[in-house]
Amino acid sequence: MPSSPRTGAAERRGDQILRHRILCLTTDPAMRRALKRLMTAVGALTEFIADPSQVATASEDGPPSLVCIDLRAPELTLASVEAVFPEKRLICIVGGQDFAQISACLSLPRCGSVITYDDKFEPEDFIITVTKLLHGQIFGVQKYFPWGVTLYNMEIASYDDKIKALDVLCAYAELAGARGPVRDRMALVAEELIINAMYHAPVDDEGKPLFRHLPRKELTHIDFERRVKVSCASNGQHFAIAVRDQYGSLDKDTVVKFLSKGALAILEPENRDSGAGLGLVSALKTANQLIFNLAPAIGTEVIAVFDLDLMHQGHAGVRSVHVFTDRRRPPPPDPEPPRIPMAPMVAGALAVILIIFGIVGVVRKIQEGPPTMVSAEVPLLDRDGKTEEVPIKVGNTDLKLRLERKGSRVVISSH
């Protein structure tokens, strides 16, 4: 039934309120209804098409802000979306916990988010993802919790600090309701992420690892100049651990490389030269959400979110993986102080010394005696024997001149 003119006008006014537009490829009517409501919450208008051939119609209003594809439908594949606004970032929707499919999606340069859509779908995850992609503010575990949830922060500068931080995380996880086996798996993920931030993330100005070549025993005695920041929070159902370094050496290619190992039945031993190692695989198979916030040459934040209810039911492993990249430029290095040639400095110093000695000599000369000629205004000596005293000042020296009339002469003396 066609809509009335009044309804159409209301829809046009509503479209003007929403600043962003998201193009979604899906054949699922239920998903269309759900995503339309969710995207309205973030100020975005959602346009749906069922086939990539309909892109021409969808592009009449210009390119969208984001593209979303529902890979649960057999006819929709990663290859089919290659030509759909290839310059726009892509969110992939999958139907199950398929690590190989997750890695394949993230291997696309334009794709940074893979979300599972089933009966356990979490709307908040989709809202947070779209908001971060649209506005670019990617760091912070507080984005994954409602207002009012307490966030606990710690800083790690040594091996002993790491042990204390893990004790705090385990104690807080127990208070939050995590049972023994679940708590142990969460602690293992936390330790792996902290080790990556402490030992694998630090690099020099040329990007070469600082500590990766050192033996483990020697690493336990190092105090780190750039501290690792660890945060944790819980709302009773979700427990999150965030680990942040201050180097920003982790890139998306490395993340995808190690996440792809999650699809292997038998994991290879960790190669210490490989960087983040199998700790990321451990997080992939334990946490329910895994978020990588990357700021090249600035910092890396890895957030692992655990759904306590799902984990207690035996449903471990990621349901969504996100790799966000901060496009800020790294701060420029501090400029080197200008180098001044030594020869002019020496010559200038000698000149100053000579001037000082000259001034001292003049003062001493003044103090030795009055000058031979002094001009001053004196009263008229109109008779023989009349005397007058005239005060004068030479530099900082006060003198008095005595004038005496002797016949036709005037005798001047100082005292």
For the regions a protein language model found, what residue spans apply to each?
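Short, low-complexity patches enriched in S/T/P/G
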Residues: D334-M345
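Conserved beta-strand-loop-beta-strand hairpin that lines the nucleotide-binding pocket
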Residues: Y144-T150, M198-P335
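Ser/Thr/Pro/Gly-rich low-complexity linker/stalk segments immediately outside membranes or between
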Residues: R364-P379
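Conserved acidic segment of CheY-like receiver
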Residues: L18-A30, L35-M39, E47-F48, A56, ...
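A short, hydrophobic beta-strand element within the central beta-sheet of small alpha/beta folds
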Residues: V67, E87-Q101
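Active-site beta3 strand of CheY-like receiver
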Residues: G62-A73
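Alpha4 helix (beta4-alpha4-beta5 surface) of REC/receiver domains from two-component response regulators
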Residues: E75-S80, G96-I115
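Bergerat-fold GHKL ATPase/HATPase_c domain
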Residues: F99-S103, F121-L188, Y199-H213, D253-V255, ...
